[in-house]
Curated annotation (Swiss-Prot):
Name assigned to this protein: Dihydrofolate reductase
CDD domains: DHFR
Binding site for NADP(+): 239, 246-252, 292-294, 314-316, 365-372
InterPro entries: AB_hydrolase_fold, DHFR, DHFR-like_dom_sf, DHFR_CS, DHFR_dom, FSH-like_dom
Lineage per the UniProt record: Eukaryota, Fungi, Dikarya, Ascomycota, Taphrinomycotina
């Protein structure tokens, strides 16, 4: 088994490492299933005390998330609830020592002041930056900023130039009065690969499932090693129970609809829209990338999926595809530990010496891999089969594309051109295996990669 991700978690003002771990609540418990979370304590002693006669000041101090007996520390000095940014260099040296002892770390989660110092830290460590006297550590693969902000003093501008290129997820509260959306927006503007999740709360780490899975999916969208040197556009293809966005139950599909299954097979097999066959190649084959549980759920007679290159994403280096010792390894079936590794494997196995030309690359599930692909910079398209019936499910697609500003629905002619086969338009009557009549609809969405879309989410109306 490969090692789990290691994540550096930086607390906010008047907190400590243990307090932040506790304040993360169910998020910490959930993420700990997938990663090692480490919680250092800042070196700045916070002596902030509220005037006992000032209720507003008491509420504001409580909102910062400290605990009476939990220790009160920070990463910057503060006066009258405003960051002076004193001791920032001491804090970086403290973090550096912790990283040398406990690291290296794959990524960072920072809350409030922890996000503020974390943004500086990530920028100093990103590729292409000159050596600095404060921190020595490999670049982070991802950063998550909750209630994050940019230091507003001009002497700190060098921490935001050039822009942070490390993939960043910004989680901000629409009711946050301590770090308003306008301040979070200033940080997003200095991040080149930014994603934004908004929650309706105040200055907190939101506990709802969508944010827990969002952080997890974002962390695992980062490549386990170097980003692929052989980029190809990725297309997610999924059938979804609407409106609950269910995609499975007990690791199997809760419906069996002939038209839906035929559409999936035809689209992922068709190479009509993959261009001309190159000289020296005998055929074009598409790639289907899936999670281990998704592959294991396929009927054995259908594994691997015929006439397609199958790649299973698993961190188990001993995964054997469910084969017995006597069974021969099928052709065009491989394992990789992440999407980027899968693309590198495709380039290695189907290069100039191969007679097979690679067509489209599809992400076919399950929910964990969909979540990772959602944040992957190479994901450009989503083929969304909407089943207009709500089935009981225990796994779900991570978002509704029709309600997302990051995705734009394409016209039906564009759908047909993209898949290369005729597709019926609108809501179609179909029958499930138990003769129950349902309606299905085939949709195509294109991803909007413009960072201004993320900034629009943080606009103040």
């Amino acid at each position: 088994m490969s090692k789990p991700l290691k994540v550096l978690c930086l607390h906010g003002w008047i907190q400590s490492g243990p307090v932040f771990s506790k304040k993360m609540g169910s998020v910490q418990k959930y993420l700990s299933k997938y990663a090692e979370l480490h919680f250092p304590t800042g070196p700045v002693v916070a002596d902030e005390e509220a005037d006992p006669n000032d209720e507003e000041e008491k509420k504001r101090l409580a909102a910062l998330g400290g605990e009476q007996n939990g220790g009160k520390f920070g990463w910057f000095e503060v006066e009258d609830f405003k960051n002076t940014y004193g001791s920032w260099d001491e804090s970086l040296e403290c973090i550096n020592q912790y990283m040398q002892e406990k690291g290296p770390f794959d990524g960072l989660i920072g809350f409030s002041q922890g996000a503020g110092i974390g943004a500086m830290l990530a920028q100093m460590l990103q590729p292409g930056q000159p050596p600095n006297p404060y921190v020595q550590h490999p670049p982070f693969k991802f950063v998550v900023f909750v209630g994050g902000f940019r230091a507003e003093k001009p002497e700190f501008d060098h921490f935001y130039n050039p822009k942070l290129t490390t993939p960043s997820l910004h989680i901000a509260g629409t009711s946050d009065t301590l770090v308003p959306l306008a301040r979070s927006k200033q940080l997003v503007e200095r991040c080149e690969n930014a994603h934004v999740l908004l929650h309706p709360g105040q200055h907190i780490v939101p506990q709802q499932a969508v944010y827990k899975t969002g952080i997890r999916d974002f962390m695992f969208s980062a490549p386990t090693k170097e980003p692929t040197k052989h980029p190809r556009d990725l297309t997610m293809i999924v059938a979804v129970s609407s409106p609950n966005l269910g995609i499975g139950k007990k690791n199997s599909m809760p419906w069996h609809i002939k038209q839906e299954m035929a559409y999936f097979a035809n689209v992922t097999s068709s190479t009509e829209s993959s261009g001309q066959l190159e000289e020296g190649k005998s055929k074009i084959m598409n790639v289907v990338i899936m999670g281990r549980s998704c592959y294991d759920s396929l009927p054995k007679k259908n594994r691997p999926l015929k006439d397609r290159i199958n790649i299973v994403i698993t961190r188990n280096s001993n995964y054997n595809f469910g084969l017995t010792k006597k069974e021969k390894m099928p052709e065009n079936l491989y394992a990789a530990d992440c999407i980027d590794s899968a693309l590198d494997l495709v380039a290695e196995k189907y290069g100039a010496d191969s007679d097979i030309q690679v067509g489209k690359v599809f992400i076919i599930g399950g929910s964990f891999l969909y979540g990772s692909a959602l944040y992957h910079p190479l994901t450009k398209n989503l083929l969304f089969t909407r089943i207009h019936k709500e089935y009981p499910c225990d796994s779900f697609f991570p978002f509704e594309p029709a309600e997302s500003s990051d995705w734009v629905r394409k016209a039906h002619p564009e759908l047909e051109k993209f898949v290369g086969i005729p597709v019926e338009e609108g809501r179609l009557k179909a029958a499930s295996s138990n003769k129950e009549e349902v309606e299905i609809e085939f949709e195509l969405y294109g991803k909007n990669d413009d960072v201004n879309v993320a900034l629009e989410k943080l606009s103040i109306c």
